[in-house]
C-alpha cells in the first residue's frame, strides 16, 4: 500500500467523522472545488424517479450545501463506517446507515461509497451504491427497516 493510498483512506475516515459531528468546514477543506457528486451515473433511475435531494447530481463544491442541508433534515439513528479500502486514487467505504426522513419514512441500508481523489489528496468525485428501491420507499414515507436488512 502506498502512502497516497493510506492518506486517501485516512481522508475518507476523517470525512465521516466530520460528517457525524456536523463539521462542514473540515469536510469542505477535503473536497476539491470542481467535485462531482453523484454525477457520473449513465442512467440512475432513482435520480429520475423523484429520489431525495441529497441523491441528485451536484457539480462543484459550492453546490454541496444542497446535499448537507437535505441530509441534515434526516434524523440519524446510525452512521457506522465498517471498512475503508483504498487503492491508488480511489477509496471505497462500506457504511451502515439508518435514519428517519422528513416524510416519516425510515431507511436502513448498508452502502458502498466510492471516493476519487486528485493528486493533492482532495475528493474530486463521490458515488453512492445503495438499495435505491428502499431509498425511494422511505422517501414516500415507508418504513424500510421491517425485517432483516
Model-derived regions: residue spans:
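A beta-strand edge to alpha-helix "cap/lid" segment located at domain peripheries
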Residues: 2-7, 69-149
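Short glycine-rich loop/turn motifs that provide flexible caps or phosphate-binding loops at active sites
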Residues: 21, 59, 103
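Short, mixed-charge, low-aromatic patches
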Residues: 18-28, 50-53, 68-72, 94
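A solvent-exposed, acidic/Ser-Thr-rich amphipathic alpha-helical stretch
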Residues: 33-88
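Hydrophobic pocket/interface hotspot
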Residues: 12-15, 27, 35, 60, ...
Amino acid at each position: 500500500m502506498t502512502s497516497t493510498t493510506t492518506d486517501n483512506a485516512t481522508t475518507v475516515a476523517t470525512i465521516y467523522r466530520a460528517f457525524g459531528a456536523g463539521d462542514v468546514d473540515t469536510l469542505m477543506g477535503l473536497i476539491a472545488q470542481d467535485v462531482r457528486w453523484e454525477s457520473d451515473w449513465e442512467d440512475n433511475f432513482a435520480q429520475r424517479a423523484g429520489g431525495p435531494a441529497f441523491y441528485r447530481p451536484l457539480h462543484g463544491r459550492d453546490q454541496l450545501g444542497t446535499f448537507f442541508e437535505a441530509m441534515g433534515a434526516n434524523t440519524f439513528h446510525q452512521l457506522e463506517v465498517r471498512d475503508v479500502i483504498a487503492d491508488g486514487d480511489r477509496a471505497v467505504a462500506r457504511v451502515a446507515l439508518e435514519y428517519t426522513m422528513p416524510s416519516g419514512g425510515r431507511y436502513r441500508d448498508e452502502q458502498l461509497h466510492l471516493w476519487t481523489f486528485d493528486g493533492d489528496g482532495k475528493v474530486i468525485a463521490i458515488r453512492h451504491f445503495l438499495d435505491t428501491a428502499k431509498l425511494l420507499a422511505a422517501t414516500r414515507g415507508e418504513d424500510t427497516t421491517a425485517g432483516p436488512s
